[in-house]
A protein has these predicted regions:
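Short, hinge-like loop/turn segments at secondary-structure boundaries
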Residues: 12-15, 39-42, 121-125, 153-156, ...
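Conserved phosphate-binding/catalytic region of the ribokinase-like
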Residues: 95-99, 149-191
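Glycine-rich beta-alpha junction loops
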Residues: 1, 52, 110-112, 169-171, ...
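Conserved N-terminal subdomain of the carbohydrate kinase-like
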Residues: 1-78
């Protein structure tokens, strides 16, 4: 959004050399904000200020082929698939990235409030974009939406995924790659 938060995000990305493929700041809504609450046992819960949020107003015509062509990595997540016209713009970005031979990554990143509790709708949108994706980041809970952890190798074959990283909170993470499963232990954080 064209507000203090949106300008801060834009400047921070620029300072770190991250090129945005959507250059305009949205006039129709404010920047979507996420508020994270930690429970005593370390579980996170999310609340979003997004009624509507600027991210929901990204349009297909905002996605320019030249920007995709000049990119190295195209990354998106399911939050941008939860509302039109951003969903169509996201699909276009991922499709163009694939067609142009870019590394395409995708974070399933299911958030109940953004999908109004409809995991099936999220799973349907995610499987729609998987043919364009090389690398998927998914949590163990999100894997359940897509057939479960045991289905990850089959999902990789079906959609031509190069790697899937499954995060398991305090239990670490697994990386599925080249018919192998690699494990990394969790690192204790101070969040």
């Amino acid at each position: 959004g064209d507000d203090d938060f949106g300008r801060f995000l834009k400047e921070t990305l620029e300072e770190h050399g991250v090129r945005r493929i959507i250059s305009r700041l949205c006039q129709e809504a404010v920047t979507t904000m996420a508020f994270v609450t930690l429970s005593p046992d370390g579980d996170r819960s999310f609340t979003f200020a997004r009624k509507p949020g600027a991210d929901m107003f990204i349009r297909e015509d905002d996605v320019r082929e030249d920007d995709i062509r000049e990119s190295v990595i195209i990354h998106a997540g399911s939050c941008s698939l939860s509302a039109s016209p951003a969903a169509e713009a996201t699909v276009r970005s991922l499709r163009l990235g694939r067609e142009m031979g870019k590394l395409v990554s995708f974070d399933v990143n299911y958030r109940d409030v953004m999908w109004k509790g409809d995991q099936d709708a999220c799973a349907a949108r995610v499987t729609e974009v998987l043919p364009y994706v090389d690398l998927v980041k998914i949590s163990d809970a999100e894997a359940g939406m897509l057939g479960g952890e045991a289905n990850i190798p089959e999902m990789m074959k079906r959609y031509g995924l190069t790697a899937v990283v499954e995060t398991m909170g305090g239990d670490g993470a697994k990386c599925y790659f080249n018919d192998k499963v690699l494990f990394a232990a969790a690192v204790k954080g101070n969040c």
